[in-house]
Amino acid sequence: MTSRYERQEKIGEGTYGVVYKARDTSTAATVALKRIRLDSEEEGVPCTAIREISLLKELRHENIVKLLDVCHSEHRLTIVFEYLDLDLKKYLDRENGNLDAATIQHFMRDLLRGVAFCHQRSVLHRDLKPQNLLISREKELKLGDFGLGRSFAIPVRKFTNEVVTLWYRPPDVLLGSMQYGPPVDVWSVGCIFSEMATGTPLFAGKNDADQLMRIFRFLGTPNNRVWPSMNQYPNSNNMLSQPEFLQNFEPEWSNVLGSVPGYEKLGCAGVDLLERLLRYEPSERITAADALNHPYFSLQF
């Protein structure tokens, strides 16, 4: 079966396995092959691969990368995806971080459509970041790399908290939250929205504590009013009793929005949407579906 695909060049390493650009000899289409080696000691296919396959088979949407085929041999599993040669990180770098207001709005709408579709189907992505958002020739943005994706249909399941690249990780996960739902992706969307506006990651932390500190400085030190569940996470006591977290930071939010170039491209409505995405309390973050109906998307740029 894999002989149908002519491998051309290695284009990256995914959550696991190697990704190649290839040609489908039966259609002449360019495709991406994600190859996963199956170690003889291991029983069957890595669970991350099975998770990605089963999720993507269910998720058919224009803003989600298409899974075209799955080839399985004794030593290797090959997942065939539509080929997109550009991700949002590369796109931002190419434009020197300077996207115009209309492009930001367009990408943001695509991102939220993909995320809302996942959430409607009880699927969390859990690793949203610019490198996992692919851009087509037609400038459509699509969610890719579902290696960490997880169905959340069973309500009170404990998830592992080793998810989401640090910079796009919400404060509840930084404090060790093991039970979370769609708000984990919504926080990441907020971070990506800000990065599209300014060209720079909003919270580029070096470790969990530094990441949380950057969030505290930006949003202000939380209290039980703005974050009722803040003391209920596994690492709350440990982390929040450190001297640096006992300082009272005034929010830098309005100063940053007023002084960092790029935020003006969002308009007042875009800034309001950003604030609703980046709430401390997970249940108070706007949903992806509600975000699509936000006045920001009525703005004409």
UniProtKB/Swiss-Prot annotation:
One cellular component (GO) term of this entry: nucleus
Lineage of source species: Eukaryota, Discoba, Euglenozoa, Kinetoplastea, Metakinetoplastina
Originating species: Leishmania mexicana
Subunit structure, interactors included: Forms a stable but non-covalent complex with a regulatory subunit and with a cyclin.
Keyword match Nucleotide-binding: yes
EC code: 2.7.11.23
Designated name of the protein: Cell division protein kinase 2 homolog CRK1
Domain Protein kinase: 5-297
Active site: 127 (proton acceptor)
UniProt GO MF annotations: ATP binding; cyclin-dependent protein serine/threonine kinase activity; RNA polymerase II CTD heptapeptide repeat kinase activity
Residue numbers of Phosphothreonine PTMs: 160
Keyword ATP-binding: yes
Annotated catalysed reactions: [DNA-directed RNA polymerase] + ATP = phospho-[DNA-directed RNA polymerase] + ADP + H(+)
Assigned keywords, A-Z: ATP-binding, Kinase, Nucleotide-binding, Phosphoprotein, Serine/threonine-protein kinase, Transferase
Family, similarity comment: Belongs to the protein kinase superfamily. CMGC Ser/Thr protein kinase family. CDC2/CDKX subfamily.
Activity regulation behaviour: Phosphorylation at Thr-15 or Tyr-16 inactivates the enzyme, while phosphorylation at Thr-160 activates it.
